[in-house]
From Swiss-Prot:
Keyword Transit peptide: yes
Protein name as annotated: Succinate-semialdehyde dehydrogenase, mitochondrial
Protein family: Belongs to the aldehyde dehydrogenase family.
Keyword Coiled coil: no
pH dependence remark: Optimum pH is 9-9.5.
Quaternary structure annotation from Swiss-Prot or TrEMBL: Homotetramer.
Length: 528
């Protein structure tokens, strides 16, 4: 009931993927060679013990209670990588009970003891970054270099919160009366339900689990059904690092049942979710009856604003990075490229030339910079957006159609003369399409950029410090990059405003999301 509709779309999309893959397996010999490479990677991961297919409950690897499974596919080839346990209500309730029981002992460890466990987990993640990167490429599709980069990025949150665990400070308040002493304590909120997406199968987990465990909370993770294998591998390394049974549980499979169990259980005191705004709203409503704390990192509609005075090379490089990372499948991707009149044509030409050089292919192939989209439903969405724009007067400079590789590959695309009556200027594309929108003045740029319900990330390219200051103050976004397209880091807060979410992840502020504040008043303190 709670996340059922979205989950069924995701699961249905997976089934569509299998059937479409079957019909598309008459691809080139190049794709068949890719298939062989993926198979060898899968075999290596299995022999290393990192290719787990069971859920983790109470420190034990378990099949689903009814022995049902779901298939995990390689989006580049359509091949089945593994059959993983398809868990539901009963398994999730047991995972919650396990986390609830483990909370007492885990939260009573000293911060230093929890820190050491997290540090060992970080060390293991880094030691296995090649295998984890291969696993990400296998089930999510992004290029191997980018996937290994995600492992380093994801691990950085575990390292950071291993250190931050020892810096959860309370406060002493000057008393209002002479016989009182006033204290403020910070204590872990309790059991956390973490629901994570497919586009960053490792980093979206560590960004939530790191601060949760560091603060003394215990966690039940529900990874995406499309990419559960990375989550399970990370959990295996967490066990090896000494995370005790029950402190970290992983259940996957029947998304509606798992979501409902997490949201309705009074033992779960917090929900943290990364995903679409539509699903986030449903989670908020479902969390209300038990008044859970909720953190939401939701959809974006990021503008990349290129002013006339921008350095053209810097603007092209930064916008390229902001738009085409993970084939455009990130919530902070530049969804709209706003370009001022005086530089519009020059930017369009230079940017298109840069996009033309992107290499599309299987993530395991050397030189690939753009992998497949996650499934056929994602490709169909991109096609719909492009067709809508063209029908309303936009012009395709390059790309604009499925790639000759077939499957779920889509050509990196640049479209000019995009206007605000087109779907792609209003909704998240989540694909490798860059719409170029013309503007005249600074005021126009700010108005266009803010004309959206979203407010996650924005980017500015200008050589004027004064202009950058005026614009980033006026932009209604949680993150702003100035002359830079890749801005997320473990040491800075990540999160949106408006309908892009609640709360922050990363940095010292991310720790506060997993802590309760307790005020203590000591009276009769003048008695001898």
């Amino acid at each position: 009931m709670v996340i059922g509709a979205a989950a069924r779309v995701a699961i249905g999309g997976c089934r569509k993927l299998i059937s479409s893959h079957t019909s598309l397996l008459l691809v080139s010999s190049q794709c068949r060679q890719m298939s062989m490479d993926a198979q060898s990677v899968s075999e290596k991961l299995r022999s290393s013990g990192l290719l787990r297919t069971q859920g983790l409950i109470g420190g034990k690897w378990l099949d689903s209670y009814d022995n049902k499974t779901i298939k995990v596919n390689n989006p580049a080839t359509g091949e089945i990588i593994a059959d993983v346990a398809c868990m539901g209500t009963k398994e999730t309730n047991d995972a919650i009970a396990s986390s609830y029981e483990a909370f007492t002992s885990w939260s009573r460890l000293t911060a230093g003891e929890r820190s050491k466990v997290l540090r060992r987990w970080y060390d293991l993640l880094i030691a296995h970054k090649e295998e984890l990167g291969q696993l990400i490429t296998l089930e999510q599709g992004k290029p191997l270099k980018e996937a290994i980069g995600e492992v380093a990025y994801g691990a950085s949150f575990i390292e950071y919160y291993a250190e931050e665990a020892k810096r959860v400070y309370g406060d002493i308040i000057p008393p209002n009366l002479s016989d009182r002493r006033l204290l403020v304590l910070k204590q872990p909120v309790g059991v956390v339900g973490a629901i994570t997406p497919w586009n960053f199968p490792l980093a979206m987990i560590t960004r939530k689990v790191g601060p949760a465990l560091a603060s003394g909370c215990t966690v039940v993770v529900k990874p995406s059904e499309l990419t559960p294998l990375t989550a399970l591998a990370a959990a295996e390394l967490a066990l090896q690092a000494g995370v005790p049974p029950g402190a970290l549980n992983v259940v996957m499979g029947n998304a509606p049942e798992i979501g409902d169990a997490l949201l309705t259980s009074p033992q779960v005191r917090k929900i943290t979710f990364t995903g679409s705004t539509a699903v986030g709203k449903k989670l908020m409503a479902a969390a209300a009856p038990t008044v859970k704390k909720v953190s939401l990192e939701l959809g974006g509609n990021a503008p990349s604003i290129v002013f006339d005075d921008a350095d053209l090379d810097v603007a092209v490089k930064g916008t390229l990075a902001a738009k085409f990372r993970n084939s455009g499948q990130t919530c902070v991707c530049a969804n709209r490229v706003l370009v001022q009149d005086g530089i519009y044509d020059k930017f369009a030409e230079a940017f298109s030339e840069a996009v033309q050089k992107l290499e599309v292919g299987d993530g395991f192939r050397d030189g690939t910079t753009q992998g497949p989209l996650i499934n056929d439903a994602a490709v169909q969405k991109v096609e719909t957006f492009v067709q809508d724009a063209v029908s309303k007067g936009a012009k395709i400079i390059i790309g604009g159609k499925r790639h000759s590789l077939g499957m779920t590959f889509y050509e990196p695309t640049v479209i000019r003369d995009v206007s605000d009556n087109m779907i792609m200027s209003k909704e998240e594309i989540f694909g490798p399409v860059a719409p170029l929108i013309r503007f005249k003045t600074e005021e126009d740029a700010i108005r266009i950029a803010n004309d959206t319900i979203a407010g996650l990330a924005a980017y500015i390219f200008t050589n004027s410090v004064q202009r950058s200051w005026r614009v980033f103050e006026a932009l209604e976004y949680g993150l702003v990059g100035v002359n830079e397209g890749l801005i997320s880091t473990e040491v800075a807060p990540f999160g949106g405003v408006k309908q892009s979410g609640l709360g922050r992840e990363g940095s010292k502020y991310g720790m506060d999301e997993y802590l309760e504040i307790k005020y203590v008043c000591l009276g009769d303190m003048n008695r001898h």
